[in-house]
């Protein structure tokens, strides 16, 4: 049985790690390089770095920060935000990331998924999906709609269709973020996560809403996710990575042991 992964997300604005609720009210909480080192040493399985302003404000990825973070940790590391071309992908991978995450750019230009997969391999391309629950309709039969630009723009695209299309185009993994749950610490969107996980053949990372260790247990079991992304619950010192993993083990969930 493959071990489930605990992934820490570092949202970065203007070179500082930040955290908001439903993409609003962001406050600075620390230096991303220092925080990356802390989480790596604590035993997180992967790290995700998002330049959360890059897509909206059309700024390039902060390559220097990416390089310094990648030099600090020795676990898989993905980078997203402002990546809109194969050249952007190459720059980030050369800076030290193992994976690149495309979200808004892929919605606007789906070919970027295929181009990235062909250039660097499927395993390097993560399809980031920001999703909001809406009324079911002929256009959005699943009741979950794709939004972009930090949740500001509704795209009229059904989330289930887009997940399957992303896989067909070459994405090797999906990072599925519920805007409704993001930052609330009230639990992941289990229905959404299970819907996507059951209907694609690539790993799904659940994102948005983790507040207590049991929330991870729920989404890894009921939501059938392959990994859970966390931020608030560790950024503010509420829980540690070892505490979270110990809880998951107590639930019969296979997780990787901390590196010694």
Swiss-Prot record:
The active site is at 11, 130. Its main location: cytoplasm. GO terms for cellular component: cytoplasm. SUPFAM superfamilies: Ribulose-phoshate binding barrel. Disulfide bonds: none annotated. Its EC number is 4.3.2.10. It is found in: Cytoplasm. The keyword Amino-acid biosynthesis applies. GO terms for biological process: L-histidine biosynthetic process. Pathway: Amino-acid biosynthesis; L-histidine biosynthesis; L-histidine from 5-phospho-alpha-D-ribose 1-diphosphate: step 5/9. It is an enzyme of class 4 (lyase). It catalyses: 5-[(5-phospho-1-deoxy-D-ribulos-1-ylimino)methylamino]-1-(5-phospho-beta-D-ribosyl)imidazole-4-carboxamide + L-glutamine = D-erythro-1-(imidazol-4-yl)glycerol 3-phosphate + 5-amino-1-(5-phospho-beta-D-ribosyl)imidazole-4-carboxamide + L-glutamate + H(+). Keywords: Amino-acid biosynthesis, Cytoplasm, Histidine biosynthesis, Lyase. One of its GO terms (molecular function) is lyase activity. It comes from the Bacteria. Heterodimer of HisH and HisF. IGPS catalyzes the conversion of PRFAR and glutamine to IGP, AICAR and glutamate. The HisF subunit catalyzes the cyclization activity that produces IGP and AICAR from PRFAR using the ammonia provided by the HisH subunit. Belongs to the HisA/HisF family. This is Imidazole glycerol phosphate synthase subunit HisF. It comes from Desulfatibacillum aliphaticivorans. The lineage of its organism: Bacteria, Pseudomonadati, Thermodesulfobacteriota, Desulfobacteria, Desulfobacterales.
